[in-house]
Design a protein with these regions (language model features):
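Membrane-anchoring/interfacial helices and their immediately flanking loops
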Residues: 60-92
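Juxtamembrane inter-helical linkers in multi-pass membrane proteins
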Residues: 103-123
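N-proximal short alpha-helices
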Residues: 63-71, 107, 114, 150-151
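Generic detector of bulky aromatic hydrophobic side chains
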Residues: 86-88, 99, 112, 132, ...
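Catalytic Zn2+-binding segment of zinc metalloproteases
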Residues: 95-108, 186
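Active-site recognition of the HExxH zinc-binding catalytic motif
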Residues: 87-100, 139
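Metalloprotease/metallohydrolase-associated module, dominated by Zn2+-dependent proteases
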Residues: 2-60, 118-207
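Short, charged juxtamembrane terminal tails flanking transmembrane helices
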Residues: 208-212
Length: 212
């Protein structure tokens, strides 16, 4: 049964560990970038692996492929609008789908163009750590896996547009990993969270374990 968010304000059972104003989410992310937890270590490791694989690919291609480095870079730049137009909305729609699969129905996708960010929230829907893990990783896994498959399917120079989209999406997932990193350092199995539309905030609470 879905937990009621009002239960989290019972100070005999839960303590509030974090309150994030949605307009301040970028400042919060900036404070979570150190690789001092598995989530951020994985994030940096994945992106470093992409860079290494990209350099190996382009080194091979410029010696044997029938296109120039300049052509590859032009196509790479063309992948930027591909990311902005297609993958940013898809990423948030997958977050919304994950919310829906978990049982949330009051889900919104909110653009904040002045801060160059888009995010999905579910009003007063309580998530435990496992549910938040599913929510955070659904777009990362599905989109990046799809793009990696496309690298081996799309021929010639055009795969560099996919490389561009993959780079931008993989690095753009940093907010999801920053939140996972925060949770992983703060008793994750006893921590829950929910979004509040009206206050434009996300709250994190930890269960007081010595209370039944």
């Amino acid at each position: 049964m879905q937990q009621n968010y009002r239960e989290l304000w019972d100070e005999t059972r839960y303590r509030k560990v974090l309150e994030i104003q949605h307009e301040d989410i970028l400042s919060f992310i900036a404070g979570q970038l150190r690789p001092n937890n598995f989530a951020m270590q994985f994030f940096y490791g994945f992106n470093i692996a992409l860079v290494v694989f990209f350099l190996l690919t382009i080194s091979r291609d410029i010696s044997v492929a029938p296109f120039s480095l300049f052509s590859a870079m032009l196509v790479f730049m063309a992948g930027i609008p591909l990311f902005l137009i297609l993958l940013v909305p898809l990423h948030e729609m997958l977050h919304a789908l994950a919310f829906f699969l978990l049982g949330a129905r009051k889900v919104r996708i909110i653009p904040r163009w002045e801060k160059l960010m888009v995010y999905a929230v579910a009003d007063k829907f309580v998530l435990n750590f496992r549910e938040f893990l599913f929510l955070a990783l659904t777009p990362f896994v599905l989109i990046n896996l799809g793009l990696i498959i496309l690298l081996f399917v799309i021929p010639g120079v055009w795969k560099y547009a996919v490389w561009s989209a993959l780079f931008f999406h993989a690095t753009g997932c940093i907010g999801d990993f920053a939140l996972l990193g925060f949770l992983s350092r703060n008793n994750p199995l006893e921590t829950v969270n929910y979004d509040d539309f009206s206050e434009q905030k996300t709250f994190f609470f930890e269960k007081i374990t010595n209370v039944d």
